[in-house]
Curated annotation (Swiss-Prot):
Keyword Metal-binding: yes
Role: Monothiol glutaredoxin involved in mitochondrial iron-sulfur (Fe/S) cluster transfer. Receives 2Fe/2S clusters from scaffold protein ISCU and mediates their transfer to apoproteins, to the 4Fe/FS cluster biosynthesis machinery, or export from mitochondrion. Required for normal regulation of hemoglobin synthesis by the iron-sulfur protein ACO1.
InterPro entries assigned to the protein according to its UniProt record, in alphabetical order: Glutaredoxin, GRX_PICOT-like, Monothiol_GRX-rel, Thioredoxin-like_sf
A single MF term (Gene Ontology): metal ion binding
Complex formation: Homodimer. Interacts with ISCU. Interacts with BOLA1.
UniProt keyword rRNA-binding present: no
Compartment(s) where it occurs, according to its Swiss-Prot or TrEMBL record: Mitochondrion matrix
Designated name of the protein: Glutaredoxin-related protein 5, mitochondrial
Length: 157
């Protein structure tokens, strides 16, 4: 990452660590493990990415991300109040890890899917967060971003 994207990701990582660990995730977040039934075939992956409105393939779980980029994705979703999503830990299944890279033709993890469509990784999600596109995409899915409430509260003061 370069410049402002790197600084913003670093700030998110620091914020996430200081926000307190446990109890952040509501009942909607499903750390689904590999969930692919021991494989990463295109048919299985197609079913996984279309199963939920928001699907994330990451290293680790939302409660314990195992890399900074996965942590940043989790924190961005948390900032927006997105709690109902499926999270698949690619570290649990090497076939899933390679399969999702082949499926998306994207070489890195994490990977984010909205309504069955590949969005990108950490850098893309961070950019969408910064420029407001993520709020709009979530709105299309019927998901209200918590940042809208925060902005409304600030505007009323």
């Amino acid at each position: 990452m370069s410049g402002s994207l790197g600084r913003a990701a670093a700030a998110l990582l620091r914020w996430g660590r200081g926000a307190g660990g446990g109890g952040l995730w509501g009942p909607g977040v499903r750390a689904a493990g590999s969930g692919a039934g021991g494989g990463g075939s295109a048919e299985q992956l197609d079913a996984l990415v279309k199963k939920d409105k928001v699907v994330v393939f990451l290293k680790g779980t939302p409660e314990q991300p195992q890399c900074g980029f996965s942590n940043a994705v989790v924190q961005i979703l948390r900032l927006h109040g997105v709690r109902d999503y499926a999270a698949y830990n690619v570290l649990d299944d090497p076939e899933l890890r390679q399969g999702i890279k082949d499926y998306s033709n994207w070489p890195t993890i994490p990977q984010v899917y909205l309504n069955g469509e590949f969005v990108g990784g950490c850098d893309i999600l961070l950019q969408m967060h910064q420029n407001g596109d993520l709020v709009e995409e979530l709105k299309k899915l019927g998901i209200h971003s918590a940042l809208l409430d925060e902005k409304k509260d600030q505007d009323s003061k």
